[in-house]
Amino acid sequence: MILTNQLISIMKTLMGLAGLTMAGFMLLSCNTEVKEANYQIIPLPQEISVMDQAAPFILSNGTKIMYPEGNEKMQKNAEFLASYIKDLTGKSLAVQAGTDGKGIILQLGGNAENPEGYQLKVTSDQVVISGPTEAGVFYGIQTLRKSIPVAQGVDIALPAVEINDYPRFSYRGAMLDVSRHFFPVDSVK
């Protein structure tokens, strides 16, 4: 009788531990992982001011990319950014005309003197990429793209920052070392 009571007590303890272990695994599997963007990219932008105390912008499936209505070049920029984000994170972001609201906003203007300069400002509600020309906004998109980590199935935290950048030289060049690193034709185009 005593042996049976001890056996029942041990069984209850083991069942309780198994239940707690399963509950722990269930809680961990529901946890949403967030990866953080890194603004230390090449080429390094001219000015980077990170706001350490401010909340980051969370790039998730519900994020929208907005551009000025009626501007086809900016629409192409927005679609280009959406395709890059999909390749990097697997997230399909909606692209829509307009520049009001929460999300990633592409706009013309800003205080960049160079036509290829841009300003990238990240707050908890918005990522605003502005430039005096569509080319400037395009280069701002490149900075944002390089900052986003390759991470499928997780949200991306973009730390609050203000980046002002412009080309140091009047020309842009690139070299493809295809003898050691082969590139598909689509990526070269």
Locations of the language-model features?
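A generic structural signal for short
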Residues: 2, 70, 180-181
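Acidic, contiguous N-terminal accessory segments
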Residues: 30-169
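An acidic-aromatic substrate-binding cleft motif
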Residues: 160-189
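Bacterial Sec-dependent N-terminal signal peptides
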Residues: 1-40
